[in-house]
Structure formats: structure tokens, C-alpha cells
Amino acid sequence: MQEKKYGLFTTITMITGIVIGSGIFFKSDDILQYTNGNMLLGIAVFLIAAIAIIFGCLTIAQLAGRSDATGGVIGYAEEFVGRKAAGALGWFQVIFYFGTLVPVVAWVSGIYACQLFQIESTLDNQMMIGFVIMTLFFAMNMLSGAVGGYFQNASMIIKLIPLLLFAVIGMIYGKPGAVISHDIESIKSTGVSAGWLTAFAPIAFSYDGWIVAVSIGHKIKNSKRNLPIALIISPLVILACYILYFVGITSLLGTDTVMAQGNDSVFLAATQIFGHIGGKLILIFVIISVLGTLNGLILGFIQL
């Protein structure tokens, strides 16, 4: 009988930790550009985009509640559809999904590592560092899945710190109510063009990766109960974090400043809060966020 290693909390951090990567830190300006600086429409974009992950999770939760098959969605496909469908899905996941996502996320970790340690940011250096990091995480998870689970829990908690910090400080020292009131009046007076719908493009990838968590279903304690619960709770946690961070940083800096500063807006906000070390702190949090995503992907990959 296989040892059950992961509890409900690890399962939730697996889903949220993979989905919440580094991208959310740098998406606020893109969304505001597409919505013409309207924060309320930006919130609507997050809500509508979350429909896919929420109902996707609810759908898979129904299968998870009926099966504890190994291999995640591949096991579900074999049990509820057939071996051919499971085989096709398995090859797709190995070659096109994990086979591309894992190296790309590892490379991104190499990019941020070069920035943090002031290493010459050449493609060779980025890829070499990313390869070393990827190899270390594969070794860690293959030698001890429990250690991988602990890292997933820790990285998820750590990456939430700056998101919630910006949210709280923005709510306190910014004026989100005034911004939303202004946005409502703007919509009433000028209307809304269809152009704001293009804001879905920059955040589409910000909701990806949740399906990986079902790969560890056979290692989850009482998986028929805990996995469906995690699949229901996690998308709501992700949505709440995204909206709170977006509202917080936009209220703190102002929509015009966020759009003008672009990706540097998060570093500007961090500098206002923490002083000259703010930029370094944010970079550390971003790297931890990427490593949490990478660890979750690898943890799910080796359980296929």
C-alpha cells in the first residue's frame, strides 16, 4: 500500500503555489493599460478570467471525489473514458505540458537569480543557473517527496507576504473607495468600449497550472475528501489574492503612476514601504514565488 504523504494544506498550497508565480507582480500595469486606467474594470477582468479555473476545478473535483487513481487526469481519463484517451493525454502532458513548462519556469528562475546576484544576464548564464536549479529540485523531490511538500508549504506562505502586504497598505494609505467611485462615474459618463476585453490576454497564464495538483492524488491522505475540498478552496484563494494585490498596489501608487512605471511599479511601491532595500526584497520574494511554481510542477510531474 502506498504511503499517503500529503494533507489538505499541502494540497491547497500545491494548487495555489503553482498558479501564483511571479507574473502577478508585474500584471497590474498591463491590465490598467487595456482598461484605460479603470481599476473597476480590472477587477472585473480578474473575476471573469477566474471562471475558467473555478469551474475547471469544480469539474475535476467531481472526478476526484469518485476516484483515487494514480496519474491525476491521466488516471481519470483511463477510468472514465478509456485507455486510448488516457494514453494520448499522457503523451501530451509529458511532452507538451510538463516538457515545456518545467524548463521555461526554471529558465525564469535563472533570469531573476542573475538580477539578484548581479551576474551577467546572458542567455547562457540564465539557462545554466536554471538547469542547476531544476536538477536540484528534481533530486530533492525524487529523494524525498515529503521535503518537496514542506518546501511547497513554505514557499506558498512566503509568496503571500508581499501580496497581502501591498493589499493591506494600499487599502489603508490609498483610497480604493474613491478610485472605484471615480471609475463608476467614468463608465456612466463615457461608457465602455470592447477594448477592455483584451486585458484577458496578459492574465490568462496567471491562472494556469492548477490541474497539476491532481497528479499527487494517490499520495494525498483521504484523497476522495481532501482533493475536492482543495480544488474548491484554492481558486477562491487565488482570486482573492490577485484582486487584493491589484487593488492595493493601484490604490497605493495611483493608476497613472502604475501605468507610467510599468513593471517597475512594484519596485517603486516596495521602495516607498521598505526604503532602498525594497527592490531587493521584492526580487527575493519573486524568486521564491518562481521556485514554488517550479517545485509544484516537478512534484506533480514525477507522480505521473
Residue ranges and their predicted role:
Residues 1-40, 53-58, 70, 184:
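Membrane-interface "cap" regions at the ends of multi-pass membrane proteins
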Residues 5-15, 82-97, 129-133, 190-201, ...:
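Select transmembrane alpha-helical segments in multipass membrane proteins
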Residues 29-31, 79, 196-226, 230, ...:
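Helix-loop junctions at the membrane interface of multi-pass solute transporters
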Residues 30, 54-134, 139-142, 147, ...:
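Hydrophobic transmembrane alpha-helices that form the core helical bundles
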Residues 38-45, 154-158, 214-250:
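Junctions where cytoplasmic loops transition into the N-terminal start of transmembrane alpha-helices
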Residues 75-78, 82, 115-119, 232-295:
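TM-loop-TM module centered on a large, flexible mid-protein loop between adjacent transmembrane helices
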Residues 126-176, 231-235:
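Membrane-interface loop-to-helix entry segments
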Residues 157-187, 204-206, 246-253:
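Hydrophobic alpha-helical segments and their helix-loop junctions in multi-pass secondary transporters
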